[in-house]
């Protein structure tokens, strides 16, 4: 642990004089003199000083500043106030204190929350991380003024604690009475307060070691530094590392809480910008012009070269990396430009490998899994601070990936409650929190790339895609594209895949030694707030194409060149900036194809539809066409871009491949076989029933409440074979007579109403013909003849309303 040296007055004045000489650089370059004048003109009170400049001018003082921060910063701030007073005395009286912020190269003191140990206490350190929690901004009293009405005196009191630079904190007791127990009144207008906020930063997920929880550290922000950051921001904090004693009751425990008292907060870029040189820009322009016809195909072919096949999926992922155009309309509505993709398929079809490639290629990507993520873990959570008890807002994965990509593996393993939480993020690009007295809105403008397995583990070809997917339509419509990746048995394709995988295992990177373990995602860390080698990186040459390797690229033709990963990142970064506009021709084509997709969706029910065709599909077509135009570095979305977008949507929505047609034929053959078997079984049962009826006794009646026999027996009850030929002739004569009688519709309706009354009065399901005739013609002006009754009953029999058997009418 670095020992803290308490400066006496002589050393403090000497340090103050050294810092004043450093700021007064009029005879040198006048950098800080100009900065102080700008500070006065901008009405600011914090000066940003580079440690590199101080190290060049006074190396001894710079080392003392880094190792003994509290006393040195107090001297530095006093020197700044004296220097401001020498330039503008009236401005120096406006503020009680002026503050110093540091930047530059900190060397070994440029750390992460994991490497921030006790040896850095009382030192100036620079910590990188992601903001995960932010407390509310609260006023903190610095000086209170109290008035005593009895004595007519005014009492002033200053407050300092361990979060200030003063070496000895004062008592925190707020005075209410003077020495003579006279009550005091607080003069709030004369009291001085400062803003106070506490944030928590967590180490970068890409720098955290695998298998270990990410570390975090609390940062205290005061005055002008508050509200500079929000959850999800990647920042560099320069400040003093200090320990605070942990109190339990009236005693101080042996464990200490450490905080970082910030003096400068620098926001790192949302998009990690690669270093561009003039040569890189020239190569990007040349590549887009020379390959203007097939630039999209070339980039998609070079995407994830270690994965064989999946051409349409690679094109879609390239569109996801490029993105559409985000629009904020005048009426306040938001149209997202991010593209969301869902990959569903059998195991071992490289879904997770495609996700991993996006993690390495996208400028900002956050990986999560379905089982290891909750709804609030993906969006945002409101937590309670253990010490103060106040509410805090904690950012989730989608908020941390703002302006980036969220890769969710095992998407089907999430619960429905957790999946519902991301609905707003996927469409509106923001997270709205309204709970525990906190109403906040966080930006989460990120693309979602999810991978999932079908409901049955493997894709069942005899079920519809919607049954295999098993996700609700409200979620599927938010995905722009949904790809079904099948593991099909094709000897030729299997041979190509096996050859490709074996070549990947035989490849060894240049300079790799035998038995060396390769570090995952290792890179050189820059131990400064600014990249000192930025100009040197600019001069490095970026190759457009990869050097041909027989193991990596196989025995392909020399014409099929692979774009290098470094050039791909730079090209995508430049292409994302372009905002192409729709032409009239492409807009008309997209509208026509959208209406055709809707009609195709409603007309052909046997088509293998993967997701619903809604109004969001129209926006999907526009986003995909815009991304294709970005790949061409075009300022307009032309007809060829719209055609490519429609082709992608047709492939993803309807799966128009030959295998699907074979499956439909096979399914139809199976259905015809089933129908033949059913017909045979029906014939067999009818023959059995005929045999039973021939052996039945004479006069045996049909029981309408016996459902043991099938419905096919019912029409045979009309003409039982046990009846003699005389009854058959009578029945035939009756039917002939009924056919001769002409019935009018009012007459038929009257008969139906009278028949219903007869059944209701009898409270039975069957009535004899004689009783029926008497009941219908009772008290009727125009009675029904027997021919009319037979005609009405035959009409109702044809409509399956009644059944007549052996002089008994049954109500169906």
UniProtKB/Swiss-Prot annotation:
Residue(s) carrying Phosphotyrosine: 705
Record has ATP-binding as a keyword: yes
Organism this protein belongs to: Mus musculus
Family, similarity comment: Belongs to the MCM family.
Main location group: nucleus
One function term, GO molecular function aspect: ATP hydrolysis activity
Residues noted as binding ATP in the record, renumbered to the chain: 664
Function: Acts as a component of the MCM2-7 complex (MCM complex) which is the replicative helicase essential for 'once per cell cycle' DNA replication initiation and elongation in eukaryotic cells. Core component of CDC45-MCM-GINS (CMG) helicase, the molecular machine that unwinds template DNA during replication, and around which the replisome is built.
Modified residues (Phosphothreonine): 719, 722, 729
PTM-bearing positions, type N6-acetyllysine: 293, 547
SMART domains: AAA, MCM
Protein's UniProt name: DNA replication licensing factor MCM3
EC number: 3.6.4.12
């Amino acid at each position: 642990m670095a020992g803290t040296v308490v400066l006496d007055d002589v050393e403090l004045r000497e340090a103050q004089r050294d810092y004043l000489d450093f700021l007064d650089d009029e005879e040198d370059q006048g950098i800080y003199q100009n900065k102080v004048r700008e500070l006065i003109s901008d009405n600011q009170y914090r000066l940003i000083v580079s440690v590199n400049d101080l190290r060049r001018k006074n190396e001894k003082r710079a080392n003392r500043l880094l190792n003994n921060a509290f006393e040195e910063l107090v001297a530095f701030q006093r020197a700044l106030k004296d220097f401001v007073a020498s330039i503008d005395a009236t401005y120096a009286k406006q503020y009680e204190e002026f503050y110093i912020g540091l930047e530059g190269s900190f060397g070994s003191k440029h750390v992460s929350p994991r490497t921030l140990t006790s040896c850095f206490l009382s030192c100036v350190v620079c910590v990188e991380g992601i903001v995960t929690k932010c407390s509310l901004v609260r006023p903190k009293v610095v000086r209170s003024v109290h008035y005593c009405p009895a004595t007519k005196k005014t009492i002033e009191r200053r407050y300092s604690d361990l979060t200030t630079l003063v070496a000895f904190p004062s008592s925190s007791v707020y005075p209410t009475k003077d020495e003579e127990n006279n009550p005091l009144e607080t003069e709030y207008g004369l009291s001085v307060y400062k803003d106070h906020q506490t944030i928590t930063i967590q180490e970068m997920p890409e720098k955290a070691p695998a298998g270990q929880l990410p570390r975090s550290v609390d940062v205290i922000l005061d005055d002008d530094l508050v509200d500079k950051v929000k959850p999800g921001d990647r920042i560099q904090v320069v400040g003093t590392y200090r320990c605070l004693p942990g109190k339990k009751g009236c005693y101080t425990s042996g464990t200490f809480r450490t905080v970082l008292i910030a003096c400068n907060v620098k926001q790192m870029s949302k998009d990690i910008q690669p270093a561009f040189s003039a040569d890189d820009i020239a190569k990007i322009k040349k590549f887009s012009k020379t390959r203007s016809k097939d630039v999209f195909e070339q980039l998609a072919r070079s995407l994830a070269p270690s994965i064989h096949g999946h051409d349409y999926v690679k094109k879609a992922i390239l569109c996801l990396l490029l993105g559409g155009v985000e629009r904020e309309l005048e009426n306040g509505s938001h149209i997202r430009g991010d593209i969301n993709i869902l990959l569903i398929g059998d195991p071992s079809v490289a879904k997770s490998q495609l996700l991993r490639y996006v993690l390495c290629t996208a400028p900002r990507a956050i990986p999560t899994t379905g089982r290891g993520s909750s709804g609030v873990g993906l969006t945002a959570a409101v937590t309670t601070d253990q010490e103060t008890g106040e509410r805090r807002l904690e950012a989730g994965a989608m908020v941390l990936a703002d302006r980036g990509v969220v890769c969710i593996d095992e998407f089907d393993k999430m619960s429905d409650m957790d999946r519902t939480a991301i609905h707003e993020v996927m469409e509106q690009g923001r997270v709205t929190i309204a709970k525990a007295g906190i109403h906040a809105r966080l930006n989460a403008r990120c693309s979602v790339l999810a991978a999932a397995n079908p409901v049955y583990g493997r894709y069942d070809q005899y079920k519809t895609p919607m049954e295999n997917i098993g996700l609700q339509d409200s979620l599927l419509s938010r995905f722009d594209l949904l790809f079904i990746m099948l593991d099909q048995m094709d000897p030729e394709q299997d041979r190509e895949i096996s050859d490709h995988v074996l070549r990947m295992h035989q490849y060894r990177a240049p300079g790799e030694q035998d038995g060396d373990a390769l570090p995952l995602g290792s890179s050189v860390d820059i131990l400064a707030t600014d990249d000192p080698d930025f100009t040197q990186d600019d001069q490095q040459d970026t190759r457009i194409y990869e050097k041909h390797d027989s193991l990596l690229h196989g025995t392909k033709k020399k014409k099929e060149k692979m774009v290098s990963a470094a050039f791909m990142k730079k090209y995508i970064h430049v292409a994302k900036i372009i905002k192409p506009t729709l032409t009239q021709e492409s807009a008309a084509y997209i509208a026509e194809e959208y209406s055709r997709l809707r009609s195709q969706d409603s007309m052909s029910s046997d088509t293998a539809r993967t997701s619903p065709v809604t109004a969001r599909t129209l926006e999907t077509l526009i986003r995909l066409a815009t991304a294709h135009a970005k790949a061409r570095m075009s300022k307009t979305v032309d007809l060829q871009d719209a055609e490519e977008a429609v082709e992608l949507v047709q492939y993803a929505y309807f799966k128009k491949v030959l295998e699907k047609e074979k499956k439909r034929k096979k399914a139809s053959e199976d259905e015809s076989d089933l129908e033949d078997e059913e017909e045979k079984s029906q014939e067999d049962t009818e023959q059995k029933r005929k045999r039973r009826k021939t052996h039945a006794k004479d006069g045996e009646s049909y029981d309408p409440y016996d459902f043991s026999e099938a419905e096919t027996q019912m029409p045979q009850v009309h003409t039982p074979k046990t009846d003699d030929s005389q009854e058959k002739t009578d029945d035939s004569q009756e039917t002939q007579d009924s056919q001769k009688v002409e019935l009018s519709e009012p007459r038929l309706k009257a008969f139906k109403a009278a028949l219903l009354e007869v059944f209701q009065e009898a409270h039975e399901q069957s009535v004899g013909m004689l009783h029926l005739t008497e009941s219908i013609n009772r008290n009727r002006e125009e009675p029904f003849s027997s021919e009319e009754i037979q005609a009405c009953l035959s009409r109702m029999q044809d409509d399956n309303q009644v059944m007549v058997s052996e002089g008994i009418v049954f109500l169906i």
